Curated annotation (Swiss-Prot):
Catalytic reaction(s) noted: ATP + H2O = ADP + phosphate + H(+)
Protein name (Swiss-Prot/TrEMBL): DExH-box ATP-dependent RNA helicase DExH5, mitochondrial
Record-linked SUPFAM superfamilies: dsRNA-binding domain-like, P-loop containing nucleoside triphosphate hydrolases
Source organism of this protein record: Arabidopsis thaliana
Gene3D superfamilies in UniProt: 1.20.120.1080, 3.30.160.20, P-loop containing nucleotide triphosphate hydrolases
All residue ranges annotated as the Helicase ATP-binding domain in the record: 230-397
Residues where ATP binds: 243-250
GO molecular function: ATP binding; ATP hydrolysis activity; RNA binding; RNA helicase activity
Organelle transit peptide: 1-33
Localisation: Mitochondrion
UniProt keyword terms in alphabetical order: ATP-binding, Helicase, Hydrolase, Mitochondrion, Nucleotide-binding, RNA-binding, Transit peptide
Length: 1113
C-alpha cells in the first residue's frame, strides 16, 4: 500500500506504464479495444448465463492483491464477458480493497486511482482519419512552399534589438490606478489639495442637506460603531468586519475611512480601493456614497468596471470589481500609493476574491503601512480572521423589520393552491426543454431531487390537510414553479399591502421566460399597475439603474433577479420575497475535465439573506417554494468558486504575476483546490502553448497574460491580428464574452429560428455571429437599428456590448504592441471566411470533436467525454449532415449529457495546420495530435508538406510575437500556400477504425511467418482480425460482416462469417471469441490474394470487393 498514488492524482491513460490488458499480454501485437459506441460490431448471441463461483472470486482477489503490491502497475483491464457480467460483484470486492472500478462497455477496469467516465485508449472508434487531397491542389501548394523555402536564406525576420517596439507598461485599464511618483516640490500641492478636500467636506457636513443626510446615516447600525471601526483600523493592519445585511457596512465603512483621512489633512495622500464582486455593485454603491457626500461621481468618489468608469483628479475612494484590482497588480505588485484596500462580500468566496486574498497576504509583509479591511455579510468571519493570523473581528448587527417565512407546505395550506404533475412544468418556449419537462416522471432523478430525497422521505406533514399532503407528494423539485409564482403574485396584489416584490430565480433563462409569461398577464403586463423589471449581472447600466427607482404612486415594483440581489445590491422598497431555493452555478468535474452547469440548492446562509431582503423598510414576508424539511437539509455555506471551476485562467494570472510555482501558490489559499484540478489547468496551458514544460510563460503566454479574457479568446485575437483578419475575430471574441444576441421568444420560436438561418451559413455559429453584427452596424449607419433587431430577433443590448468589447479588445491589443492601431493593416484578409475559420480553430483548440456520419445523421465525440451533443440553439444542431470531419467548440457543459456550445466546422487541413502540435507517428504518412487521440493517415509526401507548413507557420507566429515589426508580406508564399489548403480542402478523406500500425520490429518478426493474418490469438492480426475485416469491407462500401457461431459436440465453437453474399467458415476453437477471430482471419486470407506488402494487400482486397459489388449491381 505504500506505493499507491494519492487518490487525487490522475495519470492519462496514454502516459501510464503498467497496465495489464486482459492478463495475456502479447508484446508485439496491437491490442483491439471496443467502446460503448461500437454499435456496428455484430454479436448474434448473448453471453451464456453462468454463475459466479467462489473460485472466480478467489482468483480476482489474488489479482487485486498483486496489483496493489506492484509499484509499476496502476490498473487491471479485462475484456472477458464473464467479468463484465459479474462486474458488480467484482467492483464490490475491489472497493473493499481500496481500488476503483469502472465498466466501459466491453471493458472493465480496476485501478488504484479514480477512473474517468470515458477512456479514449479503450475506444476502438477514436478518431482515425485518412486524409485525401487532390493532386492539383497539392502541386499548387508545393509550388508556393518551394518558392518560399528557396527565399528563406535571404529573409530577415528580426530587426535589431534596439529598434524593437516597446509596449507600454501600463495599459488603458491600469491608468485608472496609476499613481505617478511626485517630486518633493509637489508635496506642497498635495497639502493644498488636502486642505481643499477638508474644507469641501466640512462645508457639506454643515449644510442643511448635509445635516439631513447625516441624520439618515446615523440611523444605520454601522454608523453607531464608527469610532470602534476607525480605532481598530488605526491599530491593526488587518481587520474583519462581519455585518448583517442592511447594517450599512458597504456604504459607510469606506466613507468612515475617507472622512477620517480628509479630516486629518491626509486626503490627497490617501488612496482607498474598495472591491466589489460585481460591476452593478461597484457602480450603484459608488453613486450612493457620492450622493451621501453631496458630490458628483468623479470628485472624491469614483468607480471603475470593465468598459466604463468615472474618476477625477481628486478621487480618493475608488469602487471597482476585483478583476480590475488584479489588473493593477500586473503592473504594480506593491500597489504604490494605495493606503487602504477594502475587500467587500468576501463571504461569496468568488475565485478572484480568494486569489486576491493570497496576494494581499503576501503583500502585507512588504507594505507594513497598508491597511486591509475584509467585509462579510455572514457569520463566518473567524475563517478569514484565522487566515490572516488572528486578525481582529468587529461584528455589526443588522436592522431589519420582522419577516414572516412561508415554506411550500404553508403556502399550499393558506392559499389552497394544488400541485399536479402538469401545472409544475416551466415553459421556456423551447421545444426540447418543453419535451424534457413533459417526460419528467420517466426521467431518472436529477441531482436537485437526489439531495433532498431523504429529507422528503422523513417528513410526514401530519399537521397539514390531506389536500396539502397530496400536493406535496407530487412536488417536483427540479421545477422553478412559474405557475405557482404567478398565483402568488396575484395573491399578494389582491390581499397584501403595498411594497415591492423580489423574485429570486436561477438565471437569465428563468428571468426572461417568466418575464414574458407575466407580460401577457392583464395585471402584471400593465405598466400603469406594475413596474416589471429584471436584475442580472450582464445587463446594461441604464437597465440596472431602473431597479433602484421609486415606482409611481399606485404602481407595484416586481423585480426578477438572480442571487446578485442577495447581498451585492439593496432594493429599498421590497416588502415581499419569493425564493425558488436554487441558483445556477458552475461545478467542475476535474476527473473528467468537464464543467457542469446545473441548478443547485442554495445554502442556509443564502436563504437567510434572501429572506432578509423583505424587511428593509417595513415588516415583510418571504415565500420559499420548497418545504421546510428541504431547507433543513441545505448546506450551511456555499462551496467556494475556486473549488468548483476550471483554473486555467487563474493559473495564467499566477505566472504573469511571477508568483512562483502554481501548485505551491494555490496551496496557500484559504481553501486550496484539489491537486488534479491544478494539474488539468497546467496541462491545458501547455497544450495551447501558454506554458512550456517547465511551467514558465512562453512568448505567447506573456501576451495572453496581458489580455483580461479567456486564454482561447486571447489566442484568437493574437492570430487574427497577425494574419490580417482581426475584424471578424474581434466580433467572435466579444460575442463569446456576452449573452447570446440571438433571441428565441417562446411564442415566436419558428420565426426566430428562420431569422437566424439568414446568418447561418458554412456550418459555423461563430460566423453567424459575425454576420449578425455586421448587419447591425450597417443598420446603425442607416438609423434602422431597432427595426433590424426586431425583424431578426436580435438583442440590441448584446450587440451594443459586443461593439463596446470590440473597442476594448482592440485597445488592449494595441497596448501589447502587436498592432499599431491602423485597422487596414490588421484587416487585409478580413473577408476571407476560410482563414477566419482557421483562426477560430487556433483559438478553440483543444476543444475539438470528430463528426462521423451514419445513414441518418452523425455522431460527435471528444477526447475526454466520448459521445457528446450540440446545444439546440446551435446552427449545426439543426443539420442532418455536416460536410466537414471536425467541429471546434467554445465550451462544453454537462447537464445530463455533455453539450457543446458555439461550434464551427473545419477541414482536415485546418485542424492539422491550426490545431496543436503534431508529431510523427509510427510509420511514414502517420501523424498524431493530442497525445495520440487524433490520428491522421496519408501519403508520406502529403504528411511532409503538412509538417513543413506547420513548422514554418509556428516559427512565423513566434517571430511576429517577438518582434511585431516583422513584415508579413515577406512571407506571402507561405501564407498563400496555407490559405490555399484551408480554402480548397474538400474533406475527401474518411474515418477508419482499428487502423493498426506495424512497427519495424513487428514487420521484421513477421517476415518469417507464412501469413500476415494469423488465426492464433498470440499472432499479429489475430487479436485484431475482426477489426481488419470490418475496415476492409467499410472501405469497399459494404456493411459490417455478420458472425454466426455454433457450439460443436466436443464443446468447441465454430464461426461462419458472412459478407457480400459470401460465407467463410473458420476452424473450431475453444471459445466463441477465438472462433470469430479465426473466421475473420480466414476471410482476410481468402481476400488478400497474391499481394505481398501489407498496404498492397488492403488495396487488392478493396478492389476485389468493389469489383464484386459492381458486378453484382
Amino acid at each position: 500500500m505504500t506505493n499507491r498514488l494519492p487518490p487525487s492524482l490522475y495519470v492519462p491513460p496514454h502516459q501510464r506504464l503498467g497496465s495489464d490488458y486482459g492478463f495475456n499480454p502479447v508484446p508485439l501485437s496491437p491490442v483491439r479495444y471496443v467502446s460503448a459506441y461500437d454499435d456496428r460490431v455484430s454479436e448474434d448471441r448473448q453471453p451464456q448465463e453462468g454463475t459466479f463461483h467462489c473460485a472466480d472470486l478467489d482468483d480476482w482477489n489474488k489479482r487485486f492483491s498483486m496489483l496493489l503490491k506492484d509499484s509499476l502497475k496502476q490498473e487491471v483491464i479485462s475484456r472477458e464477458k464473464k467479468d463484465r457480467r459479474d462486474f458488480d460483484k467484482l467492483a464490490a470486492l475491489a472497493t473493499t480493497l481500496g481500488l476503483y472500478s469502472h465498466a466501459y462497455a466491453k471493458v472493465v477496469v480496476f485501478s488504484k486511482i479514480p477512473l474517468p467516465n470515458y477512456r479514449f485508449d479503450l475506444d476502438d472508434k477514436k478518431p482515425q482519419r485518412e486524409v485525401n487531397l487532390h493532386t492539383d491542389l497539392l502541386q499548387r501548394v508545393e509550388a508556393y512552399l518551394t518558392e518560399y523555402l528557396s527565399k528563406s536564406s535571404n529573409r530577415i525576420d528580426r530587426v535589431p534589438a534596439n529598434s524593437v517596439s516597446r509596449t507600454s507598461s501600463i495599459s488603458s485599464t491600469d491608468e485608472w490606478f496609476s499613481e505617478q511618483p511626485l517630486p518633493i516640490s509637489a508635496t506642497k500641492i498635495l497639502w493644498q489639495r488636502s486642505l481643499q478636500l477638508r474644507d469641501r467636506q466640512q462645508y457639506w457636513q454643515a449644510s442643511v442637506e448635509g445635516q439631513r443626510m447625516l441624520d439618515s446615516r446615523t440611523s444605520l447600525p454601522a454608523f453607531k460603531q464608527r469610532h470602534s471601526v476607525l480605532t481598530a483600523i488605526s491599530q491593526n493592519q488587518v481587520i474583519v468586519i462581519s455585518g448583517e445585511t442592511g447594517c450599512g457596512k458597504t456604504t459607510q465603512i469606506p466613507q468612515f475611512i475617507l472622512e477620517s483621512e480628509i479630516e486629518a489633512n491626509r486626503g490627497a495622500f490617501s488612496s482607498i480601493i474598495c472591491t466589489q464582486p460585481r460591476r452593478i455593485s461597484a457602480m450603484s454603491v459608488s453613486e450612493r456614497v457620492a450622493y451621501e457626500r453631496g458630490e458628483q461621481l468623479g470628485e472624491s468618489v469614483g468607480y471603475k468596471v470593465r468598459l466604463e468608469g468615472v474618476k477625477g483628479r481628486d478621487t480618493r475612494l475608488l469602487f471597482c470589481t476585483t478583476g480590475i484590482l488584479l489588473r493593477r497588480l500586473l503592473v504594480d505588485r506593491n500597489l504604490r500609493g494605495v493606503t487602504h484596500v477594502i475587500v467587500d462580500e468576501i463571504h461569496e468566496r468568488g475565485m478572484n476574491e480568494d486569489f486576491l486574498l493570497i496576494i494581499l497576504k503576501d503583500l502585507l509583509s512588504r507594505r507594513s503601512e497598508l491597511k486591509l479591511i475584509l467585509m462579510s455579510a455572514t457569520l463566518d468571519a473567524e475563517l478569514f480572521s484565522s487566515y490572516f493570523g488572528g486578525a481582529g473581528v468587529i461584528y455589526i448587527p443588522g436592522f431589519t423589520y420582522p419577516v414572516r417565512s412561508h415554506f411550500l407546505e404553508d403556502i399550499l395550506e393558506m392559499t389552497r393552491y394544488r400541485l399536479t404533475p402538469y401545472n409544475q412544468i416551466d415553459d421556456y418556449g423551447q421545444e426540447r426543454t418543453w419535451k424534457m419537462n413533459k417526460q419528467i416522471p420517466k426521467k431518472r432523478k436529477s441531482q436537485i431531487t437526489f439531495v433532498v430525497e431523504d429529507a422528503l422521505r422523513a417528513a410526514d406533514f401530519k399537521e397539514f390537510s390531506p389536500e396539502t399532503r397530496e400536493s406535496l407528494s407530487c412536488w417536483y423539485p427540479d421545477c422553478i414553479g412559474f405557475n405557482l409564482i404567478e398565483f402568488l403574485l396575484c395573491n399578494i396584489c389582491e390581499n397584501e399591502g403595498p411594497g415591492g416584490i423580489l423574485i429570486f430565480l436561477t438565471g437569465w433563462d428563468d428571468i426572461s421566460s417568466l418575464k414574458e409569461k407575466l407580460q401577457i398577464h392583464p395585471i402584471f403586463g400593465n405598466p400603469d399597475l406594475v413596474m416589471l423589471l429584471a436584475c442580472h449581472g450582464s445587463m446594461e447600466t441604464f437597465e440596472q439603474r431602473l431597479i433602484f427607482e421609486e415606482p409611481a404612486s399606485g404602481v407595484r415594483k416586481i423585480v426578477l433577479a438572480t442571487n446578485i440581489a442577495e447581498t451585492s445590491i439593496t432594493i429599498n422598497d421590497v416588502a415581499f420575497v419569493i425564493d425558488c431555493g436554487k441558483a445556477k452555478e458552475t461545478s467542475y468535474d476535474a476527473l473528467n475535465n468537464t464543467p457542469c452547469l446545473l441548478p443547485s440548492w442554495i445554502s442556509k446562509v443564502s436563504a437567510q439573506q434572501r429572506r432578509g431582503r423583505a424587511g428593509r423598510v417595513r415588516p415583510g414576508q418571504c415565500y420559499h417554494l420548497y418545504p421546510k424539511c428541504v431547507y433543513d437539509a441545505f448546506a450551511e455555506y456555499q462551496l467556494p468558486e475556486i473549488l468548483r471551476t476550471p483554473l486555467h485562467s487563474l493559473c495564467l494570472q499566477i505566472k504573469s504575476l511571477n508568483l512562483g510555482s502554481i501548485s505551491e501558490f494555490l496551496s496557500r489559499a484559504l481553501q486550496s483546490p484539489e491537486l488534479l484540478a491544478v494539474q488539468k489547468a497546467i496541462a491545458f496551458l501547455k497544450i495551447i502553448g501558454a506554458l512550456d514544460e517547465n511551467e514558465d510563460l512562453t512568448t505567447l503566454g506573456r501576451y495572453l497574460s496581458k489580455l483580461p479574457m479567456e486564454p482561447k479568446l486571447g489566442k484568437m485575437l493574437i492570430l487574427g491580428a497577425i494574419l490580417g483578419c482581426l475584424d471578424p475575430i474581434l466580433t467572435v471574441a466579444a460575442g463569446l464574452s456576452v449573452r447570446d444576441p440571438f433571441l428565441t421568444p417562446q411564442d415566436k420560436k419558428d420565426l426566430a429560428e428562420a431569422a437566424k438561418s439568414q446568418f447561418s451559413r458554412d456550418h459555423s455559429d461563430h460566423l453567424a455571429l459575425v454576420r449578425a453584427y455586421e448587419g447591425w452596424k450597417k443598420a446603425e449607419e442607416e438609423s434602422a437599428v431597432y427595426d433590424y433587431c426586431w425583424k431578426n430577433f436580435l438583442s440590441i443590448q448584446s450587440l451594443r456590448a459586443i461593439d463596446s468589447l470590440r473597442k476594448e479588445f482592440f485597445s488592449l491589443l494595441k497596448d501589447t504592441g502587436l498592432i499599431d492601431g491602423n485597422p487596414s493593416i490588421c484587416n487585409s484578409e478580413g473577408n476571407d471566411a476560410n482563414l477566419t475559420r482557421a483562426v477560430i480553430c487556433y483559438g478553440m483548440y483543444p476543444g475539438i470533436c470528430s463528426v462521423v456520419h451514419n445513414e441518418r445523421s452523425f455522431s460527435l465525440k471528444t477526447m475526454e467525454d466520448g459521445q457528446v451533443l450540440l446545444y439546440s440553439n446551435s446552427e449545426n444542431a439543426r443539420e442532418t449532415k455536416i460536410p466537414y470531419p471536425w467541429l471546434v467548440f467554445n465550451e462544453k457543459i454537462k447537464v445530463n449529457s455533455v453539450f457543446l456550445r458555439d461550434s464551427t466546422a473545419c477541414s482536415d487541413s485546418t485542424l492539422i495546420l491550426f490545431g496543436g502540435s503534431i508529431s510523427k507517428g509510427d510509420t511514414d504518412g502517420h501523424l498524431k495530435m493530442l497525445g495520440g487521440y487524433l490520428e491522421f493517415f496519408m501519403k508520406p509526401d502529403v504528411a511532409e508538406i503538412y509538417q513543413t507548413l506547420k513548422k514554418e507557420l509556428d516559427e512565423l507566429i513566434q517571430n511576429k510575437l517577438l518582434n511585431p515589426k516583422v513584415d508579413m508580406q515577406a512571407h506571402r508564399e507561405l501564407l498563400s500556400a496555407i490559405r490555399l489548403l484551408v480554402s480548397e480542402d474538400g474533406c475527401d478523406g474518411r474515418f477508419v477504425f482499428g487502423h493498426q500500425i506495424l512497427r519495424p520490429l513487428e514487420i521484421s518478426a513477421l517476415s518469417t511467418k507464412p501469413s500476415l493474418f494469423s488465426r492464433t490469438e498470440s499472432g499479429p492480426g489475430g487479436d485484431n482480425s475482426k477489426s481488419q475485416l470490418q475496415t476492409i469491407l467499410t472501405r469497399a462500401g459494404y456493411t459490417v460482416p455478420m458472425y454466426k457461431t455454433k457450439q460443436l459436440k466436443n464443446n468447441k465453437f465454430q464461426t461462419t462469417v458472412e459478407f457480400n453474399e459470401t460465407q467463410i467458415m473458420g476452424q473450431p476453437c475453444s471459445n466463441k471469441k477465438s472462433a470469430e477471430k479465426d473466421a475473420a482471419a480466414e476471410a482476410i486470407q481468402w481476400l488478400k490474394g497474391g499481394a505481398k506488402e501489407s498496404h498492397e494487400q488492403v488495396n487488392h482486397m478493396s478492389k476485389l470487393l468493389k469489383k464484386g459489388k459492381k458486378d453484382h449491381l
